[in-house]
Regions:
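Bacterial N-terminal signal peptides
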Residues: 9-17
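Short, solvent-exposed loop/helix junctions and linker helices
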Residues: 33-37, 41-44, 79-84, 110
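Periplasmic/extracellular electron-transfer cofactor-ligation site
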Residues: 34, 40, 44-67, 99-101, ...
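Extracytoplasmic electron-transfer domains, predominantly the class I c-type cytochrome c fold
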Residues: 66-122
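Positively charged n-region of N-terminal signal peptides that target proteins for export
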Residues: 1-6
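A short hydrophobic/aromatic micro-motif that marks alpha-helical segments and, especially, helix-coil
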Residues: 17, 112-113, 124-127
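Electrostatic cytochrome c docking/interface patches
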Residues: 21-42, 131-133
Length: 133
């Protein structure tokens, strides 16, 4: 019986390690006009009420929310929840933000969530030019 238990434990460990090795973060798909268009439609359907038409966090109910919705018009590198990283924005859309009004959107397909990522990043202000010395 001890040998059988060892085989079961070893097999379970192997399956766990294999599953962990195969699990990977989703990679961003290539940004295409079609994907961006899809993201803009999803944004209008699901995000405008809080984040506003311009992505400035000034939607119809945005001012009533605490904390205020994210302002996507700041430079992408300055976003609190993203800091210039598309995967971080994808994670926020997928998982939401605890203790805020930002709900998870995991019910959307992976492609739809990436489409939303590209749509909200479109609102970002361009990088400030670097000063020459």
């Amino acid at each position: 019986m001890g040998k059988l238990l060892q085989v079961i434990v070893a097999g379970s460990l192997l399956l766990f390690l294999l599953g962990t090795a195969l699990a990977k973060d989703p990679s961003p798909p290539k940004k295409t006009p079609e994907l961006l268009s899809q993201g803009k439609k999803l944004y209008e359907q699901n995000c405008v009420t809080c984040h506003g038409l311009k992505g400035d966090g000034k939607g119809q109910i945005g001012a009533a929310l605490k904390p205020l919705p994210s302002n996507f018009t700041k430079p992408f590198s300055q976003w609190e929840d993203g800091k210039g990283d598309l995967k971080k924005v994808f994670d926020v859309i997928t998982k939401g933000i605890p203790n805020t009004s930002m709900v998870k959107w995991s019910q959307l397909s992976e492609q739809e969530r990436w489409a939303l990522v590209y749509a909200v990043v479109e609102f970002a202000a361009p990088k400030a030019p670097t000063k020459k010395k």
